[in-house]
Amino acid sequence: MKNLVRWLFSTNHKDIGTLYFIFGAIAGVMGTCFSVLIRMELARPGDQILGGNHQLYNVLITAHAFLMIFFMVMPAMIGGFGNWFVPILIGAPDMAFPRLNNISFWLLPPSLLLLLSSALVEVGSGTGWTVYPPLSGITSHSGGAVDLAIFSLHLSGVSSILGSINFITTIFNMRGPGMTMHRLPLFVWSVLVTAFLLLLSLPVLAGAITMLLTDRNFNTTFFDPAGGGDPILYQHLFWFFGHPEVYILILPGFGIISHIVSTFSGKPVFGYLGMVYAMISIGVLGFLVWAHHMFTVGLDVDTRAYFTAATMIIAVPTGIKIFSWIATMWGGSIQYKTPMLFAVGFIFLFTIGGLTGIVLANSGLDIALHDTYYVVAHFHYVLSMGAVFALFAGFYYWVGKIFGRTYPETLGQIHFWITFFGVNLTFFPMHFLGLSGMPRRIPDYPDAYAGWNALSSFGSYISVVGICCFFVVVTITLSSGNNKRCAPSPWALELNSTTLEWMVQSPPAFHTFGELPAIKETKSYVK
């Protein structure tokens, strides 16, 4: 009973962070299962495992996207690492609003249940994660499935907005003495920018899906041309949220990678201020490029020219970050421990994803590539090998701090190599499929595409072996037989750590700081 009360009513940022991690792991496993079902269906031409039920295929696609985005990456990155480490890194005793933190988490399980219900009632919600009308309208999806998905989004959106308010307040008001804004660790900066993006973009999504809800149930015509509405309005509203959302997913990863590259190169991050302002620029520009998802809906040519140019400009701050990471490693004594492997893998694969993004930014090219597997390849390189690699990197980097036990290094490296090989084998062939015109979200395809699809499906099976490896690592780390206690700083940073988390014991006390730490200097590494 005491344990139940501790976890149910917890107001401790570390406990809530741990809950977010557990939740993210569960949702991630579900999302992975759906993705494997998708790849099994696409392994060869013709109907494979779904018996010709093509609506079910689209339900799988939709559920896979929602699970991975709203219930895996966001809870783990912002809720997990954010809650665990933002207060510690800024020298705060806890979050600004501990009970708000609790409700932010507990809104997510009901939201997840609503999402799963939407896949299970009637014929499910086969709209894709974009939920475009008229397909999501009452005529095309007559049951309650889409309504359940909308309520699910509302709940997880409220959760994220409350969490954002909490992070913004905490970072602005609860920094320890001497912790100026320009001394904040980069992970804290990344969470701050992310919180602002969430706060500004989610209300727009809420408005769009509420209008969709009334269109479906109360006979309004916001998105119905018959009553003077316009389905393109929905697309504008959705992508005004949807584009900042993809930066919300990757920015905390940028912060994690900066910490890891710095630690394992044995030198401070190259161009700290440049890194900070690059993240802020990405955040601002992220709101100015949404219509590049809509080049095929008949936008004016001048509009397309603007969105092409603006999208390419986002590559500049992103490039600054990539080159700063490389410059940080340049001339350092690099240790290739598991977190560093994932970080280097992140930089390499995220760069490939970014380059295909530059290709897609060209409105002329995008008209040919829109809704093909080229787009799927692009955003999976950014997410499946960007956000997810950053999550794994952060896990291996901080797992000793969180649990107070060290992970098995060899097994961690095996996990990295299997995953690296698997995800590349899955998503690289998709570029070729897209360039030869294979459309997204279609469960069958001409025989000409069979070769690359077979390879891609094989890669996804390898990735699953990698995930299993990861859970073996977690099990071994947490098992009672693991006597390898973790030092306050497992990466030997006691003398020259530039961040606070390595100054406290592993795991940190229930109340991290007996007295607030005073920060004198954050830049120098003692050699």
UniProtKB/Swiss-Prot annotation:
GO terms for molecular function: cytochrome-c oxidase activity; heme binding; metal ion binding. Cu cation binds at residues 243, 292-293. Fe(II)-heme a binds at residues 64, 380. Ca(2+) binds at residues 41, 46, 443. The keyword ATP-binding does not apply. It is found in: Mitochondrion inner membrane. O2 binds at residue 247. Its EC number is 7.1.1.9. It catalyses: 4 Fe(II)-[cytochrome c] + O2 + 8 H(+)(in) = 4 Fe(III)-[cytochrome c] + 2 H2O + 4 H(+)(out). There is a cross-link at residues 243-247 (1'-histidyl-3'-tyrosine (His-Tyr)). Binds 2 heme A groups non-covalently per subunit. Binds a copper B center. CDD domains: Cyt_c_Oxidase_I. One of its GO terms (biological process) is oxidative phosphorylation. It comes from the Eukaryota. Its cofactor is heme; Cu cation. It is a multi-pass membrane protein. Its main location: mitochondrion. Component of the cytochrome c oxidase, the last enzyme in the mitochondrial electron transport chain which drives oxidative phosphorylation. The respiratory chain contains 3 multisubunit complexes succinate dehydrogenase (complex II, CII), ubiquinol-cytochrome c oxidoreductase (cytochrome b-c1 complex, complex III, CIII) and cytochrome c oxidase (complex IV, CIV), that cooperate to transfer electrons derived from NADH and succinate to molecular oxygen, creating an electrochemical gradient over the inner membrane that drives transmembrane transport and the ATP synthase. This is Cytochrome c oxidase subunit 1. The lineage of its organism: Eukaryota, Viridiplantae, Streptophyta, Embryophyta, Tracheophyta.
